[in-house]
Amino acid sequence: MDDMLTKIQERTKCLIYILMERQIRAARLEQLLLDYISCKPHDKLCKSSMEGFTTERSLKYTRDCPQYAAVTTSQPRYRIEKRSKRFPKTAQMELENWYTENEDNPYLSKRDLQQLVHKTGLCAPQVRNWVSNRRRKERTLTISKELSDLLNQDTRCSPNDVV
């Protein structure tokens, strides 16, 4: 009975390792795909890291695991370097100018998107993300301004004003 329990525990441990490895692979693949999609076509670093993802490598977890537990996984050969978080000043100015001109309706049309991609040198997902983030920033600025106005009104009240 103990022997059977030990075998079950060993196999359970191996299955847990396999599941963890698959989750890690899926997360890595998802991140690589997101990075690759947001890269410009001429960005060699992103392309080379995606090519490296197809390289197979065998993993063995423990010597107690049965043969079927040896799993192959793909590992990138190159690390994706973190890119600069700020856009060039000219691109920021173009995007900011577009936003102020379209403040009443700050949503991109296909034509606007193409023009901004051409003017800024950024790719379409970067432009869409910037505009989305800018709308969010505008909402929070508006809300915080309204809150501060309300707080200022409350502090101006005197005890005689309260009924």
Curated annotation (Swiss-Prot):
Keywords: DNA-binding, Homeobox, Nucleus
Primary site of residence: nucleus
SMART domains referenced in this protein's UniProt entry, alphabetically: HOX
Pfam family, one: Homeobox_KN
Subcellular location: Nucleus
InterPro entries documented for this protein: HD, Homeobox_CS, Homeodomain-like_sf, KN_HD
Role summary: Mating type proteins are sequence specific DNA-binding proteins that act as master switches in yeast differentiation by controlling gene expression in a cell type-specific fashion.
Protein name from the UniProt record: Mating-type protein ALPHA2
UniProt organism field: Pichia angusta (Yeast)
